[in-house]
């Protein structure tokens, strides 16, 4: 399988059984909530999603590669473990940059909504 096929499979299985070997040891990650370096930290972040989100799902809408850049368009959804169990949805895209070894050296996520919009989804019923 090539990297696009592996990523498609990872999205389908998310957050379980991710292929961390695709990522450089010092991978740079950034999204509207956090920013860090390191594959171990990336693993921990996915672990937190598995622990704190109910029924997380990452739907891949599009994936394309141009040279050393990969763009994915997606929707992340989950249920937050609050008494009223709000369903949360974020649409966005990721820009991945491959290093010379073909590993993901940077993974930057962008959202089509603000952090406040995500917070409001948690309390929309009140």
Regions found by a protein language model. Give the residues of each.
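C-terminal and inter-domain tail/linker signature
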Residues: 1-126
């Amino acid at each position: 399988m090539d990297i696009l096929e592996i990523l498609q499979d990872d999205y389908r299985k998310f957050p379980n059984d991710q292929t961390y070997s695709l990522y450089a040891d010092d991978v740079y990650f950034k999204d509207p909530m956090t920013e860090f370096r390191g594959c171990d930290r990336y693993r921990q972040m996915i672990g937190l999603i598995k622990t704190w989100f109910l029924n997380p799902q990452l739907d891949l809408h599009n994936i394309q590669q141009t040279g050393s850049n990969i763009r994915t368009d997606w929707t992340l959804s989950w249920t937050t473990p609050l008494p009223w169990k709000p369903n949360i949805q974020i649409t966005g895209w990721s820009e991945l940059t491959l290093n010379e070894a073909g590993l993901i050296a940077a993974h930057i996520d962008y959202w089509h909504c603000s952090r406040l919009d995500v917070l409001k989804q948690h309390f929309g019923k009140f």
